[in-house]
């Protein structure tokens, strides 16, 4: 859902608020809560979960291990929920032909460098580059080569674009910026 006119192209970037992240955070939270409840019920000797009797799980070593896995899972789940609530990785790419400026903005983790803002001139863009890695975990990433700064990724590695979609996006951007396309 990009916003485009004759002189300006704004491409919004989706961050951590993806359906898969929500699903993993919920599954991890519920699973680790279950592990922690089973470990606690084996320690107390009472049934906190009525699915199976707590006498079948001895506190040492099974109950301790399940409690540890439950606590570790809750920490990982809370990390996922924090990245979702802070929307880490979201932002926008703004290409302004009229002013000759490209702005790349991303939200990061809270702290001194929460806002990542890159700004450079369009005349410093050497090319738009597509990097393709085939195999079991095939990935296609769109980069922008900047003179003196190297390659800046414009797409995330977990975005599964088809080859046609990636080529289309690269061709449109290269045409808009009037730079060549490179494929690696």
Swiss-Prot record:
User: Where, per UniProt, does this protein localize?
Assistant: Plastid, Chloroplast thylakoid membrane
**How does this chain sit within the bilayer?**
Multi-pass membrane protein
Q: What is one GO cellular-component annotation here?
A: chloroplast thylakoid membrane
Query: What biological-process terms (Gene Ontology) are attached?
Result: photosynthesis
Q: What is its main location?
A: plastid
Q: Which UniProt keywords apply?
A: Chloroplast, Membrane, Photosynthesis, Plastid, Thylakoid, Transmembrane, Transmembrane helix
Q: Name one Pfam family in it.
A: Ycf4
Q: TM spans, by residue?
A: 22-42, 57-77
Q: List the disulfide bonds.
A: none
| Similarity-based family | Belongs to the Ycf4 family.
Q: What does this protein do?
A: Seems to be required for the assembly of the photosystem I complex.
| Name of the molecule in the record | Photosystem I assembly protein Ycf4
Q: Which organism is it from?
A: Helianthus annuus
């Amino acid at each position: 859902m990009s916003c485009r006119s004759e002189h300006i192209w704004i491409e919004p970037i989706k961050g951590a608020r993806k359906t898969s992240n929500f699903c993993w955070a919920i599954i991890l939270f519920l699973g680790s809560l279950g592990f922690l409840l089973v470990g606690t019920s084996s320690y107390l000797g009472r049934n906190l979960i009525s699915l199976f009797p707590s006498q079948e799980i001895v506190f040492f070593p099974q109950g301790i291990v399940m409690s540890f896995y439950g606590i570790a899972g809750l920490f990982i789940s809370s990390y996922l929920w924090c990245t979702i609530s802070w929307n880490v990785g979201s932002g926008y790419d703004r290409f302004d032909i009229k002013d000759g400026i490209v702005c790349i903005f991303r939200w990061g983790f809270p702290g001194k460098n929460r806002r990542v803002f890159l700004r450079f001139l369009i005349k410093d863009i050497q090319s738009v580059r597509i990097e393709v890695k085939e195999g079991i975990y095939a990935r296609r990433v769109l980069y922008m080569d900047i003179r003196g700064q190297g390659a800046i990724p414009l797409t995330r590695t977990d975005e599964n674009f088809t080859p046609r979609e990636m080529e289309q996006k690269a061709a449109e951007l290269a045409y808009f910026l009037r730079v060549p396309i490179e494929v690696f």
